[in-house]
Amino acid sequence: MMLTGARPWAVDEDGRSVVWEPTQVGHTVISGITRTGKSKGSQSLVVGTLLPWVQYVGIDPSAGLLKPLKFFSGRPDDFVLGSDSDWVDSAVTLLERCVEVMRERIASLGWAEKINDFSTETPVIVVILEEYASFLTALEGHGKDGKKLKARVVSLVGTLLREGAKVGVEVFTILQRAEASVLHDRSQYSLRISYRQDNRDSIGMLFDQPEPEEISRIVSLSPGRGVLSDNGQALRWFQTPNPAYADYVRTVEERIYTGHTPLLEENHE
């Protein structure tokens, strides 16, 4: 079933609306160095898909993107912020629960190949990994077992990337630069979005065999302008809006659906 209701998050060069529909896309990665519009673009993607059949959860070391969702969703434990106490351990617990839910959905498929019909009872679960590279760095520095903890998270995220899309458990990774150490399982990302980059190797890591003129254009993009590739299609250039953060918070409050069952209940073991 094709669900509708997602709102445009950008406008392309031809003046056409760019819409992200999580029930149709799969995993998403967005990258861009500081002050390129990546944060505003991420906000636009989120508010464009605050729908009853889309359930957000996630980890945000800087707390900006996911703080309003944590506050207004009615599911505070489904969002881990860097300002939370014991946030690293809570983040690992959340990812473990995401994999558990994914396994439950796979087990319930029966003879079906994938979930085709999403609803408020069975929503697409979008797992946001904001500042994923910073998250991995924090894991590695988390005590004597930091390296093992980082490896555990990479394994959990990799499992979601390889197995989650068919049952509506999707990863939305946000990076400054696409590098092999953080863009593991890169072939699993269907939608790839970039704002300005300062590293040509990162562009080649994100997009498959970009042309030299495309690379030159990406390294010189002005703030708010970006490019995307959807399932290997030709690059599509776009412009995203630039609302104030207060507008983002207000829009989340107005649009967010509060009836989803939390992935993590308080005191979840």
Where are these regions (language model features)?
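Conserved P-loop NTPase motor module
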Residues: M1, G5-A6, A138, S187-I193, ...
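P-loop NTPase catalytic phosphate-binding loop
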Residues: M1-G110, S119, P123-V126, A133-S202, ...
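Conserved C-terminal "switch" segment of AAA+ ATPases
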Residues: P212-R225
